Design a protein with these regions (language model features):
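Sec-dependent N-terminal signal peptides
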Residues: 7-22
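Extended extracellular/luminal ectodomain segments enriched in beta-structured repeat modules
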Residues: 93-100
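Short, surface-exposed beta-strand/strand-loop-strand elements in extracellular ectodomains
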Residues: 108-122
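Beta-sandwich interaction modules
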Residues: 122-148, 155-159
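Serine endopeptidase catalytic core focused on the charge-relay Asp
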Residues: 144-219, 227-310
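Phosphate-binding active sites in nucleotide-utilizing proteins
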Residues: 222
Length: 310
């Protein structure tokens, strides 16, 4: 849910639960999504290779991160169809409610398409294509609800030498964040009010400026901020205590709010992956802030509000 605090005259979004669709995505459908049986191997994630993240107590940690080194093209099953190559790779993280994928090498060719879906084929995210390439050559996906997922790459065979896809981190959701705010957990937030409620009417612009940030297996909130040039540079005002791991792997979610005043989850179908840290000062020596810049422009369709100088 999203909440606001009238006492501080600021909109605060408690970035909580749900499963998302991808970062900026494009047209296309996975070729084997409707195939009832796929004979592919699954890479079993070694959960001994956990990455030790010491999140600040004010960060909501929902998942573990596991260190891997998976060369997608090398490990995937290849299916040839005329002049097209289709690669399928299964990944299993036993006991996970959902899995996220971080690529430390990510570069797609002009005509390639990449998809992610659960083993049950209940939904997919994608396509990702060359427009998702970044100067950092990295990308983090949103969460796919299953402990067994499939990654599908479709590419013209003549473009194979252009591809770079290497996975270095698996995010393992151990809290079932999609169902986190059930009766068991919801009592802790009973004093808060969803921003969709009437009490938020005077704060609609500021609500559109607050976003959810996923840092590996942790969640925080942040604000999009403007600058005196008013040029829509995607600056993000963040808390330094939330900075954890590489900012290039952060996922930013926009318009995460319930459709009803008593709802317990929000839409996560608008997101962007990747950022850099421009400045920061910690809680002990200063105001506990970090200034980030998202590495992609925020689409107008997200209806972003840049707080300050607007």
């Amino acid at each position: 849910m999203l909440y606001f605090n009238m006492v501080n005259s600021l909109v605060l979004i408690i970035c909580l639960i749900g499963f998302s669709f991808p970062q900026i995505q494009y047209d296309g459908n996975p070729q084997f999504f409707d195939n009832s049986y796929l004979d592919i191997d699954y890479i079993q994630i070694d959960q001994n290779n956990i990455i030790d993240r010491e999140f600040h107590p004010m960060v909501f940690q929902f998942g573990h991160e596991y260190d891997v080194n998976i060369d997608f093209i090398k490990e995937a099953t290849l299916i040839k169809e005329d002049d097209k190559s289709i690669y399928l790779l299964g990944i299993e993280s036993s006991g996970a409610y959902a899995i996220g994928i971080n690529f430390n090498e990510f570069y797609l060719s002009q005509n390639s398409k990449l998809f992610f879906y659960d083993e049950e084929k209940s939904f997919y995210i994608g396509s990702f294509d060359h427009r998702n390439n970044k100067p950092t050559q990295s990308l983090t996906t949103s969460l796919i609800k299953s402990d067994r997922i499939i990654i599908e790459l479709s590419i013209p065979s003549y473009e194979l030498n252009e591809i770079k896809l290497n996975i270095d981190t698996i995010i393992h959701d151990y809290t079932d964040i999609n169902n986190y705010f059930t009766t068991l957990n919801s009592n802790r937030e009973d004093c808060n009010i969803n921003v969709i409620c009437d009490e938020g009417d005077d704060w609609r612009d500021q609500i559109d400026g607050v976003i959810r940030v996923q840092m590996g297996g942790g969640l925080c909130s942040a604000s999009i901020i403007n600058n005196t040039a008013n040029d829509r540079t995607p600056y993000v005002l963040f808390a330094d205590h939330c900075v954890m791991g590489g900012a290039s792997g952060y996922v930013f979610y926009f318009n995460y709010q319930s459709n009803t005043c008593n709802g317990t989850s929000g839409s996560l179908n608008q997101s962007i992956s990747g950022s850099s840290v421009l400045a920061q000062e910690d809680l002990n020596s200063g105001p506990d802030f970090a200034l980030l810049q998202i590495t992609s422009d925020i689409p107008d369709s997200y209806n972003p509000f840049y707080v300050g100088w607007s």
